[in-house]
């Protein structure tokens, strides 16, 4: 699942995600892709099973959840990866290629459960539901974190652009002041020369 951006100034973020997409293509194998983000679209790619814009994803991404649920119940996927840009803090955004299936080692930890419980019915169904819930959770978190990364990038680029505009404006004013001073000095020098000649 590739989570890219749609808004302005996200080309660098999308290029990292797109680069990883191309790496997986080179390695071959049977891959199904879900692409979120207009700028990541890959036309006429048979491995893409679903494409949607970032806006469509934020409004309703049930189609992705349905594909994941169907893949789990039919045991179609040996691996599911989320590829996105991860917002860490106000100054740090990392490229993330996260395997969410099979479950990461150490997810449960070394805890020993001493409580027992009774389950009536098919435990396979319960485990599938838990796995689908986990995948949904990971997708939700990645979606919001990557949106935050995109917003931070846009904010940083906008701030930098405004700073450069201010620097150019200050440079223009400095040049105007310098020209005005040179003109005033020239007038003073002309007046002094005229007074001296009288």
Regions found by a protein language model. Give the residues of each.
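C-terminal beta-strand-loop-alpha-helix "lid" module of Rossmann-like NAD(P)-dependent dehydrogenases
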Residues: 1-198
């Amino acid at each position: 699942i590739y989570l890219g951006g749609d808004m302005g100034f996200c080309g660098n973020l999308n290029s990292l995600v797109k680069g990883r997409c191309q790496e997986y293509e080179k390695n071959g194998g049977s891959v199904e892709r879900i692409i979120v983000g207009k700028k990541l679209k890959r036309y006429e790619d048979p491995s893409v099973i679903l494409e949607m814009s970032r806006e469509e994803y934020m409004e309703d991404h049930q189609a992705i959840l349905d594909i994941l649920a169907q893949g789990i119940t039919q045991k179609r996927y040996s691996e599911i990866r989320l590829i996105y840009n991860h917002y860490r803090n106000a100054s740090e955004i990392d490229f993330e290629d996260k395997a969410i299936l099979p479950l990461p080692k150490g997810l449960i930890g070394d805890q020993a459960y001493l409580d027992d419980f009774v389950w009536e019915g098919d435990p396979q169904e319960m485990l599938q539901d838990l796995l689908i819930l986990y995948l949904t959770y990971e997708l939700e978190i990645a979606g919001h974190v990557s949106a935050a990364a995109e917003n931070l990038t846009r904010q940083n680029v906008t701030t930098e652009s405004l700073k450069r505009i201010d620097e150019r404006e200050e440079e223009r004013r400095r040049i105007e002041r310098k020209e005005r001073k040179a003109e005033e000095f020239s007038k003073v020098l002309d007046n002094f020369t005229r007074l001296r000649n009288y």
